[in-house]
Swiss-Prot record:
Cofactor annotation comment: Binds 1 [4Fe-4S] cluster.
Family (UniProt): Belongs to the IspG family.
Gene, per the UniProt record: ispG
GO annotation terms (biological process): isopentenyl diphosphate biosynthetic process, methylerythritol 4-phosphate pathway; terpenoid biosynthetic process
Catalyzed reactions: (2E)-4-hydroxy-3-methylbut-2-enyl diphosphate + oxidized [flavodoxin] + H2O + 2 H(+) = 2-C-methyl-D-erythritol 2,4-cyclic diphosphate + reduced [flavodoxin]
The protein's name: 4-hydroxy-3-methylbut-2-en-1-yl diphosphate synthase (flavodoxin)
Species whose genome carries this gene: Solibacter usitatus (strain Ellin6076)
Described function: Converts 2C-methyl-D-erythritol 2,4-cyclodiphosphate (ME-2,4cPP) into 1-hydroxy-2-methyl-2-(E)-butenyl 4-diphosphate.
Gene3D superfamilies to which the protein is assigned, alphabetical: Dihydropteroate synthase-like, Sulfite Reductase Hemoprotein, domain 1
Keywords, in A-Z order: 4Fe-4S, Iron, Iron-sulfur, Isoprene biosynthesis, Metal-binding, Oxidoreductase
GO MF, any single term: 4-hydroxy-3-methylbut-2-en-1-yl diphosphate synthase activity (ferredoxin)
Enzyme class: oxidoreductase
Residues involved in [4Fe-4S] cluster binding: 298, 301, 344, 351
């Protein structure tokens, strides 16, 4: 199924990054450091940004965290990293934003959870205060509903109303309906308090794959605010990656979604940037955006008893990802390049011909030579112990020939 045209959402400017409309779907991430620890948070924000995160969210839960925010923003800028930083507020955001105006000014957006900001009560002073600070500082907000902290009064009322229907919905359906209602009603309340329509982004986070698909389809049908997609918590490792992909792909194919995050639970001392790479890969696999040249490699079988093709595929993919920060500025379009590293003659030549550059390594009982294809045609055949280095030379030459801006010097390849 082809990806449907994007839903027509209003455009929200988040620190210079346009979200919604026909603008590219934005990849965002979140730190897991103590925000009050400026050095650790700066290091992680920069790592996430350099991995490709276009927006980075930080927890602002204490006075120390709020006081640290301007220092974090300034330190990142001093290192040349100007990624917009979003403040994540729960329970006490109204107090922190008022007491620390420099924090309010430094942040590019405020995330507000209507389930813990008094929205919907007779008095919504906490919510109103945060909206007023956003208006004063010309900042957008994301009104983020979580099913784990859904407004209990709203849910109870909707459950009671549902019980009176001739054919009541099940509890799951009512809960998802309540999430949509909470998001939309909160957005309308923000507008009543004076926030502009194009300063609001919505999200409705759940942990179940089918729940996410259903709630976002319902939310998209009743509003034109940009939508931020993601599971509340995806889980560890492959489970988290598969769950996020299974949840986001159908929604994105429907043309729904303007920003995404992969909420992976990192392994102890794991690399936080993995969530950025997974989000990018989801968008690139669907053909929605391109971030880095893709390496196609066969899974291996009895014909490929050597691990050389696996090691080479990993080395080439790593090389491409390392090169992308510099290539992004000097070689526009290189992110769409396709590279194939195949392990035997069965699919090697055919897959290589479908790539911009491909190599078919020898499998079991095959001659020890590796044909290289460029734009579908056999270019050369490599042999010996310098196959990887020679293939990288061909790859670099192709990149310079096809993508370099006129006048840019050629890359010097290394072994």
């Amino acid at each position: 199924m082809a990806v449907k045209p994007r839903r027509n959402a209003v455009v929200v400017d988040v620190g210079g990054v346009k979200v919604g409309g026909t603008h590219p779907i934005v990849v965002q991430s979140m730190t897991n450091t103590d925000t009050a620890d400026v050095a650790s948070t700066v290091n992680q924000v920069m790592a996430l940004a350099r991995a490709g995160s276009e927006l980075v969210r930080v927890t602002v839960n204490t006075e120390a965290a709020a006081a640290a925010v301007p220092k974090i923003v300034d330190a990142c800028a001093a290192f040349g990293v100007r990624v917009p930083i979003i403040g994540d507020f729960h329970y006490n955001g109204h107090l922190l934003l008022k007491k620390y105006p420099e924090c309010a000014r430094a942040l590019a957006k405020y995330r507000i959870n209507p389930g813990n900001s008094d929205i919907g009560r007779k008095t919504d002073d906490n919510f109103r205060t945060m909206i007023e600070v956003a208006i004063e500082n010309r900042k957008p907000v994301r009104i983020g509903v979580n099913w784990g902290s859904l407004d209990s009064a709203l849910l109870t009322r909707m459950m009671d109303e549902n019980s009176l229907l001739p054919e009541p919905k099940d509890a799951r359906e009512v809960t998802l309906d309540a999430m949509v209602a909470s998001a939309v009603q909160s957005a309308r309340a923000a507008e009543r308090h004076g926030l502009a329509h194009d300063q609001i982004i919505l999200s409705a986070k759940v942990s179940g794959v089918q729940d996410l698909i259903d709630v976002y389809r319902a939310l998209a049908a009743v509003c034109d605010y940009p939508l931020h997609l993601g599971l509340t918590e995806a889980g560890l490792g492959s489970k988290g990656i598969v769950a996020t992909t299974a949840a986001l792909a159908p929604v994105l194919q429907d043309g729904i979604g303007d920003t995404i995050r992969t909420s992976l639970t990192p392994m102890p001392n794991g690399d936080r940037t993995e969530e950025v790479i997974v989000s990018q890969q989801i968008l690139q696999s669907l053909g929605i955006r391109s971030f880095t040249p893709q390496v196609t490699a066969c899974p291996g079988c009895g014909r490929t008893t050597s691990t050389f093709f696996q090691e080479m595929a990993d080395e080439i993919q790593t090389y491409l990802r390392v090169q992308m920060p510099s290539w992004k500025a000097t070689h526009p379009g290189v992110e769409t390049m396709k590279v194939a590293v195949m392990g035997c003659v069965v699919n090697g030549p055919g897959e290589s011909k479908h790539s911009n550059i491909g190599i078919s390594l020898p499998g079991t009982f095959e001659e020890p030579k590796a044909p290289v294809y460029v734009d579908g045609r056999l270019m050369t055949t490599l042999k010996g112990d310098r196959i990887v280095a020679e293939f990288l030379e061909i790859l670099n030459e192709y990149v310079d020939t096809h993508y370099a801006i006129a006048g840019e010097p050629e890359l010097v390849s290394g072994d």
